[in-house]
Amino acid sequence: MQIRIYNTLGRKIQPLETVEPQTVKMYVCGPTVYDYLHIGHGRTFVSFDAMVRYLRLRGYNVIRVQNITDIDDKIIKKAQETGKDWTEIVDFYTKDYLNALTQLKIEIDQHPRVTYHIKEIINFIQKLIDKGHAYVAKSGSVYFDVDSFPSYGLLSGTKKEEWNQGEEFVKEKKNPYDFALWKAWKPGEPYWESPWGKGRPGWHIECSTMSMRYLGEEFDIHGGGIDLIFPHHENERAQSEALLGKQWVKYWVHVSYLTIRKEKMSKSLGNIIPLNEALKKWGPSVLRYWYLSSHYRSSLDFNEDSLEQAKNALTRLKDAISIIRDVIKEGPKYYSKDEDIQVQRNIVELIKSFHAAMSEDFDTAKALSYIHEIVSLVFGKIQYSRDFMSAMLAFDALRQFNYVFGVMDEEFYPTYEMLGKVIDAVVEIRNQLRMKKMYDLSDQIRAILANAGVKVLDSKDKSTWRFE
């Protein structure tokens, strides 16, 4: 089943064709650590986490890089307002960020920080100067010459002339829409030495440098919130492809807005909800479920009712797991009846539908609807029939669901002793199905076991198994 993904560059869904076979290299823009994360950040990070989990479920090796911007105008301003050293600001809010990721069960492969890559950033800028794509102003700041990159605006659809950056630095630029690669030092600000004098990196150059450092000159997915399309990602693309002279990123992926009771989150409205407060009130599993109940490209509105609905739905899922586990513990008592076989076939089709939804631009909302159809079969059929095979299929469906959604980890840690007995019983039932020439179901069971790391070995009249 081909995975397809929406590419902001081109604005269409395209087949996922990776740079390297069965490997996905992904860079997601992380936070600027000057304040607490809000629930919008949480949505972005969880959405990309679900993508990573599904790709891994499908057998891809995923390398995920998510940066930490630890030097920026906002950090300097926060330090000046609070009277604290800028490094103290960075350390405090970095801990808040990493703690949120831990609670949300998000694991990042590489977490580069800007200040650890200053030398590489300087080298990147110098190469742009050498190629004629950047210039040094009298102040010692370095700017990207936007006119030197003809396809500027292709990603965002924004015309360069429409970009208003303010008047402070316009006089020293060739054009008002040129953007800073290196910012000359001002008294009281942190700085690093460079060929152009004391200063610090601009925002956009940081991500280009770090993504190439960890993922190479061409990688598969570059993502972030929809608000980053312009100017951040547009500028990243311009400077990176100007340097390389070729395509840099294959797929640009963006998570849509999160609103608060139909209003945009903003400090002026006083409606920003810190992520740590939401985690404390609702818990990570409810938040993850709620985030993923909507397609990542659809706007999501925060209100108490929607979180309560997510909590109740998650409780129903856990209750279904309890029923399934009880039926499995009872073991197989009889051959499946015709009605049971139909339930089994329905579950198999719903598992396929789950994968079809996830394969079509990671549609978690649609995928979730199929999981709830399986849950309805658990409550409406399996808890009364006590059919072992139906329960096993439902268990596998919910296991795959949880691998992607990450909302019921505590429900999926059986002991090795129990696991061995369950596999023995499943393999025996599969063997009986083979003897009855019910090959479609026996093949499905083999595939389920293989997906769980269990290899089935068939002989003429029996089957055995081992862990792969």
Curated annotation (Swiss-Prot):
Its EC number is 6.1.1.16. It comes from the Archaea. Its main location: cytoplasm. GO terms for cellular component: cytoplasm. One of its GO terms (molecular function) is zinc ion binding. It is found in: Cytoplasm. A motif ('KMSKS' region) lies at residues 264-268. GO terms for biological process: cysteinyl-tRNA aminoacylation. It catalyses: tRNA(Cys) + L-cysteine + ATP = L-cysteinyl-tRNA(Cys) + AMP + diphosphate. Keywords: Aminoacyl-tRNA synthetase, ATP-binding, Cytoplasm, Ligase, Metal-binding, Nucleotide-binding, Protein biosynthesis, Zinc. Binds 1 zinc ion per subunit. The keyword Zinc applies. Its cofactor is Zn(2+). A motif ('HIGH' region) lies at residues 31-41. It holds the Pfam family tRNA-synt_1e. InterPro entries: Cys-tRNA-ligase (IPR015803), Cys-tRNA-synt_Ia_DALR (IPR015273), Cys-tRNA/MSH_ligase (IPR024909), Rossmann-like_a/b/a_fold (IPR014729), tRNA-synt_1_cat_dom (IPR032678), tRNAsynth_Ia_anticodon-bd (IPR009080). ATP binds at residue 267. Coiled coil: none annotated. Zn(2+) binds at residues 29, 207, 232, 236. Belongs to the class-I aminoacyl-tRNA synthetase family. This is Cysteine--tRNA ligase. It comes from Sulfurisphaera tokodaii (strain DSM 16993 / JCM 10545 / NBRC 100140 / 7) (Sulfolobus tokodaii).
